[in-house]
Curated annotation (Swiss-Prot):
Keywords from the UniProt entry: Cell membrane, Ion transport, Membrane, Transmembrane, Transmembrane helix, Transport
A Pfam family assignment: Bestrophin
Any one Gene Ontology molecular-function term assigned to this protein's record: chloride channel activity
Coarse class of the protein's main subcellular location: membrane
Listed InterPro entries: Bestrophin-like (IPR021134), YneE/VCCN1/2-like (IPR044669)
UniProt topology in membrane: Multi-pass membrane protein
Superkingdom: Bacteria
Location(s) in or outside the cell: Cell membrane
Species in which this protein is naturally found: Salmonella typhimurium (strain LT2 / SGSC1412 / ATCC 700720)
A cellular-component GO term for this protein: plasma membrane
Protein name: Voltage-dependent anion channel-forming protein YneE
Family statement drawn from the similarity comment of this UniProt entry: Belongs to the anion channel-forming bestrophin (TC 1.A.46) family.
Membrane-crossing residue ranges in chain numbering: 28-48, 50-70, 209-229, 235-255
Ion transport as UniProt keyword: yes
Length: 304
């Protein structure tokens, strides 16, 4: 995620870090070079009687803009839902620890429960990003639990099971009543709902055929555009063609980033920072001293 302070509109025009321009610059450069080639070839294909008009491109451009808008809205909805789910995880994590602390004030094993909660957040993050988990989870789980979690089809779900077992042991020993156990178990169900929601987004991409047809149409439009502009604009063709192409190609590239909100692109969710915030909150609630520093954006304003 890009976290920038409010800037003057003139400075925003020239922003590089955080924009998709760095990703699509080579494509715009190709469009610029193609436009120059079209200017050079103009006398030849005029002699052949080949003539393009802007009318079909105007109609096609409006259609592409509408469908790009639909796709971007769908991808942004995935992004918003993903952020909402991680917000729910923060609420559930704080709530269940608060209830455990107040119902079991003399419990000495709460540190283990806190580490299970932190491990769950990091495990979910690394699962969604398809990253190796053993090294990070080893900081929060004992060797036996770590082996069970890593060997599971759904490691995060296995950690939820370990948290449920921790509560069940206190219930069997009489430290938790059935009512309190049921309340705490509902919090675990909330965390399970977050897990399922994130898995649904991660495992259900925008239909490939829909993405493909838009991608093809956008690039064919941008390739043919200089031929339609050159008759009227001539030497201004490269500049106008690049400007129009930037609008369409940038929207297409932005939709690709937002489609998977759990990745590490510039405009994806800052899962590292969210997990860091959860860890800090839980450790402070448990009055621990060894607390990690809060993550801040890097020099390029990116927060991962």
């Amino acid at each position: 995620m890009i976290v920038r302070p409010q800037q003057h509109w003139i400075r925003l025009i020239f922003v590089w870090h955080g924009s998709v321009l760095s990703k699509i610059f080579s494509r715009l450069l190709l469009n610029f070079l193609l436009s120059i080639a079209v200017i050079i070839m103009l006398p030849w294909y005029t002699m052949l009687g080949i003539k393009f008009t802007l009318a079909p491109f105007s109609i096609l451009g409006v259609a592409i803009a509408i469908f790009l808008g639909f796709r971007n809205n769908a991808c942004y909805a995935r992004y918003v839902e993903a952020r909402h789910l991680w917000g729910q995880l923060m609420i559930a994590s704080r709530s269940i620890l608060r209830e455990v602390k107040t119902t079991l004030p003399d419990e000495r094993g709460i540190e283990d429960f806190v580490r299970l909660q932190i491990a769950f957040a990091h495990c979910l993050r690394m699962t969604l990003r398809r990253q190796p988990q053993t090294q990070v989870l080893g900081n929060y789980l004992d060797q036996e639990a770590l082996q069970k979690v890593v060997a599971s089809h759904s490691p995060a779900n296995r950690i939820l099971l370990l948290m449920g077992e921790w509560l069940a042991i206190r219930r069997r020993s009489g430290k938790l009543s059935d009512i309190l156990f049921h309340s705490l178990n509902n919090r675990l169900n909330d965390m399970s709902s977050v897990l399922a929601g994130c898995e649904r987004i991660a495992n259900t991409p925008v239909p490939f055929a829909y993405t493909l047809i838009l991608h093809r149409t956008v690039y064919l439009f941008c390739i043919m555009l200089p031929f339609a502009l050159v008759v009227d604009l001539h030497y201004m063709t490269p500049f106008i063609s690049v400007l129009i192409s930037y609008t369409f190609i940038a929207l297409d590239a932005l939709a690709e980033e937002l489609e998977d909100p759990f990745g590490t692109e510039n405009n994806d969710l800052p899962l590292d920072a969210i997990c860091n915030a959860i860890e800090i909150d839980l450790l402070q609630m448990n009055d621990e001293r060894d607390i990690p520093a809060k993550r801040i954006p890097d020099k390029r304003y990116q927060l991962t």
